[in-house]
Amino acid sequence: MAASSSLVPDRLRLPLCFLGVFVCYFYYGILQEKITRGKYGEGAKQETFTFALTLVFIQCVVNAVFAKILIQFFDTARVDRTRSWLYAACSVSYLGAMVSSNSALQFVNYPTQVLGKSCKPIPVMLLGVTLLKKKYPMAKYLCVLLIVAGVALFMYKPKKVVGIEEHTIGYGELLLLLSLTLDGLTGVSQDHMRAHYQTGSNHMMLNINLWSTLLLGAGILFTGELWEFLSFAERYPTIVYNILLFGLTSALGQSFIFMTVVYFGPLTCSIITTTRKFFTILASVILFANPISPMQWVGTVLVFLGLGLDAKFGKGAKKTSH
C-alpha cells in the first residue's frame, strides 16, 4: 500500500485515505455488531459471543498477514530500520488505550465515554508539542477543537432519567484520561518512527500487529479463553466466516490508517478516525430518515466547518517525504 500510494497524485491521497478508512470500517462496524450482539442457537439454549480478546487476537493476526503480503508484493525495496522497542511500546499503548476505554463504561455513562474518545486529537497534539517539540499552526489547533466539539455535540444524546444511576465518581474518568494519554503516546511513537526512521506504513502495520498478537496470545492462553472460543466455533461454525471477514475489513482499514500516519502524521489520522463515526452516523440518518436534533445540526456544521478550514488553512505540519 505504501509503495502503490506513490502512484496516487498528492491532491488525491488524503481523500483516498479518508474514503478507505470510512468504507472499510463502515462494514467492519456492521460485522462487529453481528458477531458480538447476535444470538447463537435456538430457544432457551441461545448463547452470545463473549470472547473479546480472541476476536481482537484474530483481527491482529489477519492484519499482520495482510501487511506481510503487501510488503512482499509492493514494498520489498524498503529496508525497515525502526527499533523493535518502539513497535512494542506502540502496541502496548494501543492495547492499553482500548482496554481502558472499554473498562471506563463500567463506571461512566456512554455519552461521557464518547465525549472522552472524541477528544483523541487533543492528546496527540499536546504530546507531540511537549515531547517531540512539534509545532502546528494556530489554525490547526482551532480546526481540531471545532471538529472535536462538533463530533461530541452530534453524538451526545441525553437520556431520560428513569431512576438513580450510581457509579464510582472519579475512577471511570481516570480510565478515560489514561486511555487518552495512551492514545497520545501511540501517536508520539508513530510520529517518532516517521521522523527518525522513515518507517513505511506496511512495516508499521506488520510490526505493531505482531507485537499485539504476542501480547493478546499470551492473554487468551493465560485466561483459557482460546479453548472456550474453539468450543463455541465448533457449535456455530458460521461465526468463523464472519470473523474472517471482520479481520479482512480491519486489515484493509488499518492499511489506510497507517498510510495516513506515514504521509500525514498521527494528528490527521486522529481527525479522520474521530470523524469516521460521525460520518457513519450521518449516513445512517440519511439512509433511514432518522431525525436530527438541533444540537446534532450544530455538531454537523462544526465538523464540516472544521474540516473545511483545516483543508484550507491547517497546512503547516512538516511531512516526511517519500
UniProtKB/Swiss-Prot annotation:
Cross-referenced Gene3D superfamilies? 1.10.3730.20
Q: Where is this motif: Di-lysine motif?
A: 318-322
Recorded catalytic activity of this chain's protein: ADP(in) + ATP(out) = ADP(out) + ATP(in); UDP(out) + ATP(in) = UDP(in) + ATP(out); UTP(out) + ATP(in) = UTP(in) + ATP(out); dATP(out) + ATP(in) = dATP(in) + ATP(out)
GO MF annotation terms: antiporter activity; UDP-galactose transmembrane transporter activity; UDP-glucose transmembrane transporter activity
Keyword Endoplasmic reticulum appears in the UniProt entry: yes
What does the UniProt record say this protein does?
Answer: ATP:ADP antiporter that catalyzes the exchange of ATP and ADP across the endoplasmic reticulum (ER) membrane. Imports ATP from the cytosol to the ER lumen and exports ADP in the opposite direction. Regulates ER energy metabolism and protein biogenesis. Appears to be part of a calcium-dependent ER to cytosol low energy response axis, where calcium efflux from ER to the cytosol triggers ATP import into the ER lumen to maintain sufficient ATP supply. Provides ATP to ER chaperone HSPA5 that drives protein folding and trafficking in the ER.
Please give the name of this protein.
Solute carrier family 35 member B1
Q: State the organism of origin.
A: Bos taurus (Bovine)
